[in-house]
Amino acid sequence: MKRTNKNIFLSSGALFFLIMPIGSIGHDIVFFVVCCSYSLFTFYVLSDTTSFKVKMAKSLIPLIYPVAFHVPIHIIFSDAQVSILSTASYFLAVGFGILIYCTKNRLRIVPIAAFTAITIFFATKGYDLWLHKVNYGTYLGGVEEAITNIELPNANGEKIVLTGYNDEIIVLDFWTTSCGYCFQKFPVFDQVRKKYTSNSRIKFYAVNIPISRDKSGDALQIARELPYGFSHLFSPTEAIARQFNVNSYPTVILVKNGRILYRGDVGGVSSSINKLTEEELKKMNL
């Protein structure tokens, strides 16, 4: 196919719209596919026999579609942060495609290796870190924030203090009745709890945050039907979630001595608990 501006524009458009549905599977997969396909496509465009300036101009044509479709979404909708990296992958792929093409043959292995490493990292661990940042405000979960004295009722109406004084470790799993993913993560939260049953100073609670469609007693009824060993607490308003800076569900919070020390996914809280218990053992052995 002759590499005219029109053909490049149409071909890159077809490639763009073929990739777009992959976003429903995962933006990490989009990142990988875009990096592979767009870098190769850019290299192919540059392999034409036209002058260098014309080649450079043609290599930027594939960016018309992501600029026209994705960039405005990120400008208008703050919730689109989750897909920023997959959008950036178009520019990364074209940039490295140009760099690889312009590098002399013997040195080409350097940008190829760098691009491969970046692609693999962000298509795997890097995207997980970014999602953690978007959902919880931190890349790895570690925070250190003071929290005021907070009490919430349990299923029996008894008030439970959540500030973790006297070296107690309080682990909270925030959920709502409409959050299907919260229910999927409950078994994982319970498995974490089981690991620390021998330590009476580590407490695990699932904290329900009410939503507008909840009827009185809905959350309590659901909690009583769940087959897990952790206790349930019930917030009367969303204000509690704001006090803990919870912006998405589920969110797991670890509190000790009036300070939030972890905010993130349930999968990362065990390392924070282990770190705290190890520090306590060291103090005891001094």
Regions found by a protein language model. Name each.
Residues 224-229, 236-284:
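Thiol/disulfide oxidoreductase modules built on the thioredoxin-like
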Residues 3-20, 59-68:
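Alpha-helical transmembrane segments
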Residues 128-162:
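N-terminal "domain-start" segment that seeds a small globular fold
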Residues 184-225, 236-243:
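Structural microenvironment flanking redox-active thiols in thiol-disulfide oxidoreductases
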